[in-house]
A protein has these predicted regions:
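Non-catalytic C-terminal accessory region of glycerolipid acyltransferases
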Residues: 19-22, 44, 48, 82-193
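A short, well-structured juxtamembrane/interface segment
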Residues: 2-25, 33
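Active-site phosphate/pyrophosphate-handling residues
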Residues: 14, 33-36, 125-128
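Conserved short-loop catalytic and cofactor-binding motifs
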Residues: 4, 55, 76, 114, ...
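Catalytic core of membrane glycerolipid acyltransferases/transacylases, capturing the structured
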Residues: 23-82, 108-111
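A conditional alpha-helix N-cap/helix-loop micro-motif detector
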Residues: 6-10, 60, 78-81, 119-120, ...
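Short acidic/polar alpha-helix capping motifs at helix-coil junctions
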Residues: 5, 32-33, 50-53, 90-92, ...
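Exposed alpha-helical structural elements
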Residues: 12-18, 62, 66, 87
Length: 193
């Protein structure tokens, strides 16, 4: 923690601190700012809840093992999007905060929807897991304050109604994504389609 506190400030921590210890949360993450610092979130937040994330394994297993080890060195736990979904759900049930990068093109596995008016494929996973486990979705942003300094902001939690389905819930989260991507456009690293 001491290694990064001089380059990173935290904002609106109450939005994550107020999540009950026994309840998990979905952290809606973006490729923005210094996004690799998200793997150090476990060291940064005062909650006792474990922090983990879904990740896409790299094709080269040697490089993948090295990168995964580096990312998990801060105490976060990573779950492969190909084989780790069951473990990720158990993690969430035990009160874990599960980070999911929501801004990647999801291909055939994604939900076809409009993003900034253009047809796109978005992962429905944050919506599916939030609905299934009735846990909040907390958007997390990394804004560049100056060269080499960032602010990690925990936005207001979104509690999805159990009366809506994954399609409606994903559309709702896409609106949140659009707002964040518009607000923080200089920090977003986003190449879709």
């Amino acid at each position: 923690h001491r290694n990064i506190e001089h380059i990173l400030t935290l904002a609106d921590l109450q939005n994550i601190e107020n999540v009950p210890k026994e309840q998990g949360a979905i952290l809606l993450l973006f490729h923005m700012g210094n996004w690799e610092i998200l793997t150090k979130m476990h060291e940064l937040i005062p909650n006792e809840n474990p922090v983990g994330g879904m990740y896409r394994p790299l094709k080269n297993p040697l490089i993948d093992n090295h990168v995964k080890k580096q990312r998990e060195s801060g105490g976060s736990q990573l779950f492969s999007r190909k084989r780790g979904l069951i473990m990720a759900q158990k993690f969430l049930k035990k009160g874990g905060f599960l980070g999911i990068l929501c801004d990647q093109y999801s291909g055939r596995a994604g939900l076809k929807t409009k993003l900034f008016g253009a047809e796109s494929s978005i992962t429905p996973l944050p919506a599916i897991l939030a609905l299934k486990h009735q846990c909040p979705v907390i958007p997390v942003t990394l804004e560049t304050l100056s060269p080499g300094r960032w602010e990690m902001r925990f936005h207001k939690p979104i509690q999805l109604s159990p009366q809506i389905d994954k399609v409606e819930a994903t559309h709702l989260l896409v609106k949140v994504m659009e707002n964040i991507m518009h607000t923080y456009s200089r920090d977003i690293f986003w190449l879709h389609d």
